[in-house]
Amino acid sequence: ITRRLDRFEDEMQFEYVRGFEDFVKNIREKGVKTAVVTSSNVMKMKNVYAKHPEFKGYFDEILTSEDFDESKPSPDCYLKAAKRFGLTSDECVVLEDSFNGLKSGRAAKMFVVGFATTNSHEAIEPYSDTVVDDYTGLSYEGIMRSLGQ
């Protein structure tokens, strides 16, 4: 089973959600620190890097399952990311598509943008401050407005 799972992950394409690259470039130009906080392990992330060598360059930090004691939906992973940047929860924004990730961001008391990429708007709305289909239309300015800044 493990070999089949490894082969499946090796063959995954890890396609970006529409608008991702433009969005992350936009917020980084504004000086926003960025992190990936994933329940995936280092080996799975190596598959992502193999398919998208530029991926690491989009982020200041990449935290994998090896970096935290409790997995999502515990807030631990997001709180550790905030701590690495010297930030408080109210200074952070979580972008998530999974139920456990959304719950984790909520439990960390961060602003949560839910992506309706694998689940419906209605399903993730209770766990999100706002729901979007993809990164198209998301911007630094729009998020700052949502935060009241």
Give a label for each model feature.
Residues 25, 41-43, 47-149:
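Asp-based, Mg2+/Mn2+-dependent phosphohydrolase catalytic module
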Residues 7-36, 42-46:
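Short, acidic loop-to-helix structural element flanking the phosphoryl-transfer center
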